[in-house]
């Protein structure tokens, strides 16, 4: 196991190129199960979640060739192999295997997923959708069992706007009989990306990206080639890093309209943001003005950038309030920021950040993916050396993080954990 070391205080300057979207990739790969011939996915991020999904598709009989940012999936020999345990539990997004396998085989057994532990992230809306389509769903010994004689289109109203449920119902409905209407659907760009892949395969989907999605079921889906959209969360993370420590940072391979909420908040703080067709240029400015953040479903401020933005706010003037309306337990980074000298406290669903903290390097631990990003940003801003453990979380969602940061002028490197540190990890 490794840790990431960051020598703080170095100015960032230069160009960073954004990878394909993690939150698309983890849905697009299971979607390939639905096809009857080969699916090729380009612009894949090189992250551990993608490797895990490739292994899971192989487990159910798929022939998967994973090259440099490209995956070719041959689904012809896939079977409805039960996956109650093992790798499936390491991955939050393994729940997309439910919708895809239900759509293709009319049955699935999937172990309840893991990934980031952000408090209760129930899949009740997914289950509601599957049942509306005609599936029987039971939870037996920590695995979800899905069975259906046939799937029939239905009108499904989501009680909570959920990206996962919207995509999962789409996956199950594209080969169902008749029309499915998803109301109060999520509108995230990743949903449009999945719908684009499915449409290329022959699915009939209208309204992806709006709050009402209509799907007319088809009997067969053929393979296709699809390129993933850029990762707006990775892009937002580098925007925040550039605002914190950047002189002039070019962020390439982005879709600026996907990041309007982040751009607006950075400008409110005094950061200069220049927008072009597929590029953003960020110039950090001092003094930074404190701002309040409230996470909302897209196109609001993304919950995935709440933790990284909190690190930036420790250097701003005045008091800032960060409220997460999506996940109420997404504040595990706060204790670690406090270790570094930040003045932050949690009250309910909000963290209150008293700015102008002078951060000091410390030993900190990433408890989840975006907490990891927050600690890296804090390390870039801090005086001295910060050691971040829990790198397995960061590697789930950020491709070649230290390589990209080094190119921008940061001093970042990996080291193996000492035996003493390994013992501490085991005990925790």
From Swiss-Prot:
Active site as annotated: 116 (proton donor)
GO biological process, one term: cell division
GO molecular function, one term: UDP-N-acetylglucosamine 1-carboxyvinyltransferase activity
First-level EC class: transferase
Reaction(s) catalysed by this chain's protein: phosphoenolpyruvate + UDP-N-acetyl-alpha-D-glucosamine = UDP-N-acetyl-3-O-(1-carboxyvinyl)-alpha-D-glucosamine + phosphate
Gene name of the record: murA2
NCBIfam families listed in its UniProt record: murA (TIGR01072), PRK09369.1 (NF006873), PRK12830.1 (NF009470)
Originating organism: Shouchella clausii (strain KSM-K16)
UniProt record similarity statement: Belongs to the EPSP synthase family. MurA subfamily.
Binding site for UDP-N-acetyl-alpha-D-glucosamine: 92, 121-125, 304, 326
Keywords assigned: Cell cycle, Cell division, Cell shape, Cell wall biogenesis/degradation, Cytoplasm, Peptidoglycan synthesis, Pyruvate, Transferase
Keyword field contains Transmembrane helix: no
Source species, domain of life: Bacteria
HAMAP family assigned: MurA
Sequence positions that bind phosphoenolpyruvate: 22-23
Lineage of the organism: Bacteria, Bacillati, Bacillota, Bacilli, Bacillales
Name this polypeptide is given: UDP-N-acetylglucosamine 1-carboxyvinyltransferase 2
2-(S-cysteinyl)pyruvic acid O-phosphothioketal, modified sites: 116
Biological role stated in the UniProt entry: Cell wall formation. Adds enolpyruvyl to UDP-N-acetylglucosamine.
Short name of any one Pfam family annotated for the protein: EPSP_synthase
Record GO cellular component, one term: cytoplasm
Known EC number: 2.5.1.7
Compartments, as annotated in UniProt: Cytoplasm
PANTHER family on file: UDP-N-ACETYLGLUCOSAMINE 1-CARBOXYVINYLTRANSFERASE, UDP-N-ACETYLGLUCOSAMINE 1-CARBOXYVINYLTRANSFERASE 2
